[in-house]
Amino acid sequence: MEPAETTYVLGEVPPSEGGIAYRGAIPCLQMGFPEDAALPAVNAPLPISALTCADAPAMVALTDVAFPGFFRLRTCVMGSYFGIWHPASDPTQPSQLIAMAGERLILHPSREISGVCTHPNFRGQGLAAALTAHVMHHHRQTHARSVLHVVSTNDSAIRIYHRLGFETLREVQLHRLKRLE
């Protein structure tokens, strides 16, 4: 961890370490998609593109407005990410990343869906559901089971995940740690 950087640890309260401050817990639901269930359709209103680490600044910018604190520039190296871009009205300007989803934690045979977010100006169009379904199809192709973690108070995301077929497995604690210095 870099000085002043924050990270999150799943599970039990981590032991005290010099230079690391405990900043509290966030209750989350751990959800899983049944391995034998039919996959939901991917109904994206705009094309879905593979994202690379070259897109990391746009990915961080999106998460900073949609769900701050959980995505960093190097998170892109942890798995495959996909996004939906909104074309700029001025052709001389770059497109804007308006929604994304990917994977962060890979523990065979499970892969964690992560970074699911939509820019507030584009919510309600099914983008998060389409991207989540896209990642689920990607997982099925590699014989992986899709799992995810969602903050327990994020009712809209929980509804989307249930509609896609995810089942709640258990509640877990996500512990926030910050490096001092």
Question: In which residue ranges do the predicted regions lie?
Answer:
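A conserved beta-strand-loop-helix scaffold within acyl/acetyltransferase catalytic domains
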Residues: 70-81, 85-117
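Acyl-donor-binding surface of acyltransferase catalytic domains
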Residues: 1-42
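Conserved acetyl-CoA-binding loop-helix of GNAT-fold acetyltransferases
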Residues: 118-120, 124-141, 158-163
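Conserved catalytic-core motifs of GNAT/GCN5-like acyltransferases
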Residues: 23-34, 167-181
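Conserved active-site alpha-helix within GNAT-family acetyltransferase domains
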Residues: 14-20, 129, 152-171
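Short, high-confidence coil segments that cap the C-terminus of an alpha-helix
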Residues: 4, 143-145
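Conserved beta-strand-loop-alpha-helix junction that forms the acyl-donor binding cleft
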Residues: 9-14, 138, 147-158, 174-181
